[in-house]
């Protein structure tokens, strides 16, 4: 199952990556993000669902979680929230 990891690039790059996966025959695409990029992942999913592939794609599943990461600067453990949004072809 194809996955798109959301980072700091423009939203359009991620939207087009998801659309391309569906155009290449994928039935499901998972959008993943951590921390501050969670809201960007939701924006990508909604743009794909309502603008680019309106009526063709639906949200299949949403998973939220948190994971511990070690801050490289301080060496301390931090908890970072994560999200996975599965888009499914209708």
Swiss-Prot record:
GO terms for biological process: chromosome condensation. Keywords: Acetylation, Chromosome, Cytoplasm, DNA condensation, DNA-binding. Its main location: cytoplasm. GO terms for cellular component: chromosome; cytoplasm. Gene3D superfamilies: Alba-like domain. Signal peptide: none annotated. Belongs to the histone-like Alba family. Binds double-stranded DNA tightly but without sequence specificity. Involved in DNA compaction. This is DNA/RNA-binding protein Alba. It comes from Nanoarchaeum equitans (strain Kin4-M).
């Amino acid at each position: 199952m194809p996955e798109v990891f959301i980072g700091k690039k423009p939203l359009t790059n991620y939207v087009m990556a998801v659309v391309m996966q569906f155009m290449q025959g994928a039935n499901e695409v998972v959008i993943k993000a951590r921390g501050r990029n969670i809201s960007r992942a939701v924006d990508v999913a909604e743009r794909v669902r309502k603008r680019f592939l309106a009526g063709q794609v639906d949200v299949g599943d949403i998973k939220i979680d948190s994971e511990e990461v070690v801050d490289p600067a301080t060496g301390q453990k931090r908890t970072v929230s994560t999200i996975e949004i599965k888009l499914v072809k209708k």
